[in-house]
């Protein structure tokens, strides 16, 4: 359940991640950075046929690429701490080199897919900087310490 007013204050789900994956993570992370509470109920039951609507539109390979693309976009948009940003910048070439040696293309394709949306991610990043009350380190520490966010 979501507080409608806060959902609207956050701008709702970001179309940056369209058509799938990371919308809920993005929304929750932005709420936490604004100092709002986010609750997770591990005992709740949700009935959802896994990828039932997604699979009709997207093939498995496409889903994997979009998920990897959205990982890049999430970091570019939301991770503001310089040390974490630097770590991500360092790891991008390492993932790409690893895929090259394994004759895999997932991270290469996803990276170039993400580059097309990078301007929108960086524009949103500026907005997030203005609204963030807590650092990424503080939020990640809270998530890691608070078992409520873990399954």
Could you describe each region identified by the protein language model?
Residues 1-11, 16-47:
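A short, conserved alpha-helix in the catalytic core of glycosyltransferases
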Residues 26-29, 73-74, 90, 102:
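Hydrophobic side chains within alpha-helical segments
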Residues 28, 51-54:
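Short secondary-structure transition/capping segments
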Residues 38-51, 59-60, 86-87:
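Catalytic beta-strand/loop signature of glycosyltransferases that borders the donor
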Residues 8, 30-33, 73-77, 95-98:
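Short glycine/serine- and small hydrophobic-enriched flexible loop segments
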Residues 38, 56-83, 105-121:
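Catalytic core of nucleotide-sugar-dependent glycosyltransferases
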Residues 82-151:
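Non-catalytic, C-terminal membrane-associated alpha-helical segments of glycosyltransferases
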């Amino acid at each position: 359940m979501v507080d409608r007013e806060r959902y609207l204050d956050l701008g709702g789900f970001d179309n940056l991640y369209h058509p799938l994956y990371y919308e809920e993570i993005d929304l929750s992370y932005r709420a936490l950075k604004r100092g709002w509470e986010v609750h997770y109920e591990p005992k709740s039951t949700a009935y959802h046929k896994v990828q039932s609507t997604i699979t009709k539109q997207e093939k498995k390979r496409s889903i994997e690429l979009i998920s990897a693309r959205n990982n890049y976009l999430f970091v570019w948009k939301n991770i503001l701490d310089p040390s974490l940003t630097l770590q991500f910048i360092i790891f991008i070439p390492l993932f790409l080199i690893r895929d090259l040696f394994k004759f895999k293309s997932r991270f290469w394709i996803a990276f170039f897919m993400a580059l097309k949306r990078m301007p929108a991610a960086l524009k949103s990043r500026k907005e997030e900087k203005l609204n963030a009350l807590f650092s990424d380190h503080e939020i990640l520490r809270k998530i890691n310490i608070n078992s409520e966010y873990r399954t």
